[in-house]
């Protein structure tokens, strides 16, 4: 069974999160954010962080932020919760499966992306979206090949 998709993005700044999440209705969720990512202003890395650890961001605001800014992602943890559902910590795949969280996006070392999603149609769309954007090493994460022990970076 497909759990999600993994691939590599270029180790450079841009709006990669927006490009990665295009198949997802970003505005339909509340996003729990964490990690180390910085805005890029006039081609230079800024001191201002894109995310604050464990902050909850409304979907429409989050979508605008990802779409209209340039940023450099070093480590990222994003977790999408439908409106009206409990936002809680999700640290393992089992916790994810038992929670209201619909999607987990992880970026490690600037380039390595793993996305876990409960909606099989969205997994397929994320896979083909990654191919369309010429991301590298695109593959499905399955029950058989998933070696990740935690959904954190």
Swiss-Prot record:
Pfam families assigned to the protein according to its UniProt record, in alphabetical order: DUF2691 (PF10903)
Superkingdom per UniProt: Bacteria
InterPro entries, A to Z: Uncharacterised_YncE
Protein name as it appears in the record: Uncharacterized protein YncE
């Amino acid at each position: 069974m497909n759990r999600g998709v993994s691939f590599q993005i270029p180790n450079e700044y841009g709006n990669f999160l927006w490009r990665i999440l295009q198949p997802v209705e970003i505005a339909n969720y509340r996003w729990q954010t964490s990690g180390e990512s910085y805005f890029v202003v006039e081609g230079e890395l800024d001191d201002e962080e894109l995310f604050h650890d464990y902050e909850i961001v409304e979907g429409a605001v989050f979508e605008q932020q990802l779409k209209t800014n340039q940023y450099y992602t070093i480590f990222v943890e994003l977790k999408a919760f439908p409106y009206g559902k409990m936002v809680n910590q999700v640290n393992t795949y089992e916790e994810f499966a038992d929670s209201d969280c619909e999607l987990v996006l992880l970026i490690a070392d600037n380039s390595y992306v793993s996305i876990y999603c409960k909606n099989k149609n969205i997994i397929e769309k994320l896979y083909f979206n990654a191919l369309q954007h010429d991301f590298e090493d695109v593959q499905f994460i399955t029950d058989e090949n998933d070696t990740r022990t935690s959904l954190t970076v």
